[in-house]
Amino acid sequence: MTRVVRVMSYNIRYGGVGKETELATVIQAVAPDIVLLQEATHPHVIARLADTAGYPHYGSRRGQSTGFMSRLPVASHAWHLPRGARHPFLEVAVVEPEMRLFGLHLSAWFSKWSERRRHFEIRALLEGIKEHQHGFHLLLGDFNALAPGEVLDVVHFPQWIRAMVWLSGRDIARDTIQTMLDANYADVWRRFNADDPGYTFPTWNPHLRLDYAFVPMKYAERVKSFEIVQAPPIVKTASDHHPILVTLD
């Protein structure tokens, strides 16, 4: 890799409808080279956002959760739907520096049933990208999952979600993120922040880390920083997720 590249992952909530100006303000303030989006379900919104924020290359598809915007030339992009998954994952092949980015949005909710689905989805994704696992690549997005050792504080949840957690045995398995670690991927946030909880959701009262970036362990040294975007202040109302930013060298 011959240049510094900054990659953002951002869940824009409800397709970003009516929030284009706020989202563009956040993205322009951070100025990433590439943005991977979740809940990017309205192509016309993504086109408008890309134009406003200054990204000539972009892709989204109606009904698909994942999309992207890029200032770097893109050789190709495609959506792949593993069997049984709720959302397709997005593959973006960047021309220079050569790398692949995989954007994903796993099933939501906190219950043993939804965690089983996420676990299935991530195993299917890893199987699907096997042919690329020897080259440099990143997996980023809204995993909707807890990492091993992280605390689930249900006091912040609505009553109906508390009930789901209670029915699941009063806690949630950590299989999804553990699968990534077992596959020899580095949890980028934890690489730089051993003790900081790294909460990304919700923006008005952060108490969950749902947004992750993973890199193959053998390429971990190429990642120079990981930031949870806290500014400009409008980030608190633009979406319910804080964006995350990974800097590569």
Residue ranges and their predicted role:
Residues 1-52:
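N-terminal, active-site-proximal structural segment of metallo-dependent hydrolase catalytic domains
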Residues 35-38, 138-142, 186-191:
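Active-site neighborhood of phospho(di)ester-bond hydrolases with catalytic His/Asp-centered motifs
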Residues 34, 38-116, 120:
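Structured beta-strand-rich core segments of catalytic domains in phosphoester-bond hydrolases
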Residues 13, 41, 105-107, 143-146, ...:
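Catalytic metal-binding/acid-base residues of hydrolase active sites
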Residues 119-144:
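His/acidic metal-ligating clusters that form di-metal
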Residues 4-13, 98-108, 140, 241:
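Active-site-proximal beta-strand elements of phosphoester/diester hydrolases
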Residues 43, 56-70, 83-86, 115, ...:
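Active site of divalent-metal-dependent phosphoester/diester hydrolases
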Residues 69-72, 91-97, 215-217, 237-239, ...:
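Active-site beta-strand termini and strand-to-loop segments that position acidic
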